[in-house]
From Swiss-Prot:
Keywords: Centromere, Chromosome, Metal-binding, mRNA processing, Nucleus, Transcription, Zinc, Zinc-finger. Pfam families: Spt4. Component of the SPT4-SPT5 complex. Interacts with RNA polymerase II. GO terms for molecular function: protein-containing complex binding; rDNA binding; RNA polymerase II complex binding; single-stranded RNA binding; zinc ion binding. It comes from Eremothecium gossypii (strain ATCC 10895 / CBS 109.51 / FGSC 9923 / NRRL Y-1056). One of its GO terms (biological process) is 7-methylguanosine mRNA capping. Gene3D superfamilies: 3.30.40.210. Its main location: nucleus. It is found in: Nucleus; Chromosome, Centromere. This is Transcription elongation factor SPT4.
Length: 102
């Protein structure tokens, strides 16, 4: 059984232990402001993986909206819903579960 999870906000994939110990390297400040834990904002259900070495120089990073994030493995689609406390802080939030169509 895999212990990998993906952040529902940025899509980075890490182990459950990494999220528990360190939080999300991209979104932890938002989670703290919303008074929620990183685990509440992650999902074990995700699809597709993209490795980002240089997100600022990658067209794929731009396509999946991770160009401003740290290098790492990112999920293309993440199932689940962020806590309302987080969504309320983000006026331009786009879910990573594919439910919002541009």
């Amino acid at each position: 059984m895999s212990s990998d999870r993906a952040c529902m906000l940025c899509g980075i994939v890490q182990t459950t232990n990494e999220f528990t110990r360190d939080g999300c390297p991209n979104c932890q400040g938002i989670f703290e402001e919303a008074s929620v834990s990183a685990i509440e904002c992650t999902s074990p259900s995700f699809e597709g993986l993209v490795g980002m070495c240089k997100p600022t120089k990658s067209w794929v990073a731009k396509w999946i909206s991770v160009e401003q994030y740290v290098p790492g493995m990112y999920a293309i689609k993440v199932d689940g819903r962020l806590p309302v406390e987080v969504v309320d802080l983000l006026p331009h939030y786009k879910p990573r579960d594919g439910s919002q169509v541009d």
